[in-house]
Amino acid sequence: MKQYLDLMKKVLEEGTPKADRTGTGTLSIFGHQMRFNLQDGFPLVTTKRCHLRSIIHELLWFLNGDTNIAYLKENNVSIWDEWADENGDLGPIYGKQWRAWGAADGRKIDQLSNVVNQLKQDPDSRRIIVSAWNVGELDQMALAPCHAFFQFYVADGKLSCQLYQRSCDVFLGLPFNIASYALLVHMMAQQCDLAVGDFVWTGGDTHLYSNHIDQTHLQLSREPRALPKLVIKRKPDSLFDYHFDDFDIEGYDPHPGIKAPIAI
């Protein structure tokens, strides 16, 4: 994960001070790309401990099409608490867009099911895409999608994925995003009888919050360790039938966690 540390260093050295929606202030760069070969290990940051349980539960929650935090709360995951209303609702965020995008004629489009079918029936298609950026529903969302658009690509029997993230909290959010999409690629590859290829991350406004600078310097002082290995213990009947206990991470030996405030 040296390239993640290189990105942190780049933002510190080249970032432009900018105001932001939260009022916190950032150092920001625009446009950056990283490529992770998923056959080299699972890209989980090792220079601080990442809360993998939250990453897995959040992805399963997205895949279920859920937009209420009740499932997350039941599993002691609090990462969406600050944005939920008094009933735990977040509006039509990721899960709704991925699984039930509303078409003008009233249809609900299951983008993820469509992707599975495309990968099995037409893997060379250049249209194997999922979008969470539904312009007509942005004003109903508790938080507009940060990881907004992703595309799958098959070559030589390997499945790759590229994500476009329009806004990226480099210190807190990005390690989650990388691990979450890497996990999704592994799951999708298993369902479609493919090997894993690359996960390509592309960032738009890529920033460090002003109250994360000290934590970033601490993380940069640490040496990366070997990447862990993801083990999926069974093959469910569909992409939507995975459970938390289906996943093991072997050999994860991170440095201690580093606490930092969330910009809301």
Swiss-Prot record:
Query: What is the superkingdom listed in this entry's lineage?
Result: Bacteria
Q: Where are the transmembrane segments?
A: none
Q: Which residues bind dUMP?
A: 21, 126-127, 166-169, 177, 207-209
Family matches, as InterPro entries: Thymidate_synth/dCMP_Mease, Thymidate_synth/dCMP_Mease_dom, Thymidate_synth/dCMP_Mease_sf, Thymidylate_synthase, Thymidylate_synthase_AS
Q: What is its EC number?
A: 2.1.1.45
What is catalyzed by this enzyme? dUMP + (6R)-5,10-methylene-5,6,7,8-tetrahydrofolate = 7,8-dihydrofolate + dTMP
Q: Which UniProt keywords apply?
A: Cytoplasm, Methyltransferase, Nucleotide biosynthesis, Transferase
What are this entry's molecular-function GO terms?
thymidylate synthase activity
Pathways per UniProt: Pyrimidine metabolism; dTTP biosynthesis
Query: What residues make up the catalytic site?
Result: 146
Q: Name one GO cellular component term.
A: cytosol
Summarize subunit and interaction data from the UniProt record for this chain.
Homodimer.
Q: What does this protein do?
A: Catalyzes the reductive methylation of 2'-deoxyuridine-5'-monophosphate (dUMP) to 2'-deoxythymidine-5'-monophosphate (dTMP) while utilizing 5,10-methylenetetrahydrofolate (mTHF) as the methyl donor and reductant in the reaction, yielding dihydrofolate (DHF) as a by-product. This enzymatic reaction provides an intracellular de novo source of dTMP, an essential precursor for DNA biosynthesis.
Q: What name has this protein been given in UniProt?
A: Thymidylate synthase
